[in-house]
Amino acid sequence: MAARLPPGNQRHDGEYEDLLSLWSDLESALSVVLSAPLRVQDFPAKVRQVDRWLQDLVAHDIDAALYLMFQLASTSSVGYSASHALVCGTLCHIMAQELQLPPRERDSLVRAALTMNIAMTALQDVLAGQREKPTAAQQDAIRNHPQESQALLERLFITDNLWLDVVGQHHASISDRVPLASQEPHDRLTRILGTIDRYAAMISPRKSRAGRSATDSVRAIAGHEVDQRDEVSYTLVRSVGLCPPGTFVRLDN
C-alpha cells in the first residue's frame, strides 16, 4: 500500500491523474476492509496501513489531496460508506494537525473516523441510494450503530480504548462552546469527529437529496458567523475553507 508520489513542483495534468488513481486505490482498499471486516486478516494492522497511506497522500500536497478527495467522493464507485469514511478520516487528519493534537489522540481520531460506521456499512450504502425515508428497522440500526460498531471493533481485536470510546459515542452531543483543552480526550475527539461527520454528510449527494455546497454545509453547522469559541468549526473553516478545492459553489447570479 505504499504511495509513490510525483514531486510537488513537477506535477502536470497526467500526474494529477496518477494522484487520483492513488486516492481511488486507497478508497478501494478501505472499502474492502469495511465491507467484510471479519474476513480481513489482522484487521488492526490493515487499518493502520490505510491510515499511513492516507498520511502519505495528504503530506504530498494538502490542496491536491482535498481536491482529489472531494472529486472522488462525488464519483465514487465503491459505495457511499467507504467514501464517507475516507473523507472523514482525511479531514480529521488535517484537523488534528491544525489543532496540534498529541500523536496518540490523532491516531485514535483518524482511525475512529475510518471505522465509526463499520457495523452498518452495507446499510449506509443502501440508504444513500434510497429515496424513501428509512424504515423502522433501518432507524433502529442507525440509532444503535455507534455501540454496534464499537462492539464489532472489539471483536476485531482493537485494543485502543480511546478509539473504541470515540466510535461508541460519535453521535453524542458534546458542548462546542468550551475550550477543547479543558475536555477529556474522548469528549474532545468526539466533538471533532461529530463536526466532521456532519459536514462530510452534508456535502455528499444522495438519492433522497442533493449535496449542499461546502459553504452552506459549514454555515448549517456553525452559523453564518463562525464563533471562535467553537474551535472545531472555526478551525475547519480556517484549514479547509468555505470553498474547499474540488467542491462546487453556488453563484449568486
Feature locations, PLM:
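Tryptophan-centered motif/residue detector
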Residues: 23, 66, 162-163, 248
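Alpha-helical scaffolding flanking metal-ion-dependent phosphate/phosphodiester catalytic sites
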Residues: 88, 111-123, 130, 134-234, ...
